[in-house]
Amino acid sequence: MNNLIEIRWHGRGGQGAKTASLLLADAAFNTGKYIQGFPEYGPERMGAPITAYNRISTSPITIHSNIYEPDYVVVVDDTLLDAVDVTAGLKESGAIVINTTKDAEHLKSKLNNYNGSVYTIDARKVSMEALGKYFPNVSSDTFLASIV
């Protein structure tokens, strides 16, 4: 299944990481792709770190587990860079997309010497300008789709 793309999302409860993964799954499904989109969280409260996942392929997906070696990682809240190893298992050929006002070079020191591509997007600004309200998952999905 060499056409499989695996994505891991990091966010906090209530920030839309789960919703973003499901929106991306819907969009991929509507283009004829095979998809999976699912969250991983326990009884944590709003604001606790959560993880969500996507698999997208042109072939049927027979894997049914969490994603341990993603092609892409999306970080919805840059404060998680101090709390979670978002680079764990990330392929060197992959990329990280971080919702932040900081530039990628400033953040690389928090990414455990990850040498792959790091992209930043100010999802709040994009969302406010385009939609008049803050929807971090919509602008993060759009940016991710543009680099995948």
Q: Model-predicted segments: where are they?
A:
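Active-site cofactor/cluster-binding pocket
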Residues: 1-148
